[in-house]
Regions:
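N-terminal beta1-alpha1-beta2 module of alpha/beta enzyme domains
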Residues: 1-68, 169-172
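Flexible, glycine-rich active-site loops centered on histidine and acidic residues
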Residues: 2-24, 80-149
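Hydrophobic faces of well-ordered beta-strands that scaffold small-molecule active sites
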Residues: 3-7, 46-48, 72-77, 102-106, ...
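Active-site beta-loop-alpha junctions enriched in small/polar residues
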Residues: 10-12, 51, 76-80, 107-111, ...
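Short, acidic/polar
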Residues: 23-38, 87-90, 178-186
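Acidic (Asp/Glu)-rich catalytic clusters
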Residues: 36-40, 62-70, 91, 95-102, ...
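A structural motif corresponding to the C-terminal end of an alpha-helix
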Residues: 37-43, 68, 137-145, 169, ...
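Alpha-helix-loop-beta-strand connector modules within alpha/beta enzyme cores
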Residues: 57-76, 130-137
Length: 194
């Protein structure tokens, strides 16, 4: 129930005026300045977005953890973009490498045009169903109970397992934002923070 404060990393560029989105162009130097300023001012996490115009959130966050000491990376994840077994392994590896400096921001996708352009042209309901399966698979693989089977609408696994084990027990925090009834239901079941 602790209050947390986070900041947003503008990986498509920053601005002093919202109407000019890339007034300050994106660069590794700008990202490091922003994340270090957030850390130095006591923010617990920095949100790295995922969108076509943004720099890759996973690679950017991996580099930024090396430039900081304690701030957590809140990496956005959308359904259908990364195989859930690989996603679970990526998160567990990141979690171990940084001693728990990762959280996941679940996004069902608010931009249908971008989803279709990137090959994930599912309905909103299907995106939420797929995201639910991906979260259940990640949690199942992180449970440490051995081989994991899953029989869902989108994913079917037989004897799946990953290494390394997750650092944060039982698993990292999941965040979810959204005002729809689907978002509220999903958040109540699977997210730590809404």
């Amino acid at each position: 129930n602790d209050l947390e404060f986070g900041w947003f990393l503008p990986t498509r560029g920053d601005t002093l005026d919202y109407a000019i989105p890339q007034q300050i162009p994106p660069s590794p130097e700008m990202f490091k300045r922003v994340v270090k300023a957030a850390e130095d001012n006591g923010f617990e996490y920095i949100l790295l977005p995922v969108a076509a115009a943004c720099w890759d959130a996973w690679l950017t966050s991996a580099v930024l953890t090396g430039a900081t000491e304690k701030i957590k990376m809140l990496v956005a994840a959308r359904p259908g973009y990364i195989n859930p077994v690989l996603l679970a392994k990526m998160i567990a590896t990141f979690d171990q490498m940084t001693k728990g400096r990762i959280s996941i921001n679940l996004i069902a996708g608010q931009n249908d045009v971008e989803n279709i352009a990137e090959g994930v042209g599912l309905s909103k309901n299907d995106r939420y169903e797929m995201m639910m399966e991906e979260v259940e698979i990640c949690k199942g693989l992180w449970s440490g109970t051995g081989k994991f089977d899953y029989d869902g609408k989108f994913y079917k696994l037989k004897q799946a397992h990953i290494g390394p084990e997750i650092y944060q027990k039982p698993f990292p925090k999941f965040y979810l934002g959204g005002g729809s009834p689907e978002a509220a239901d999903f958040s109540a079941k699977h997210a730590h923070v809404h």
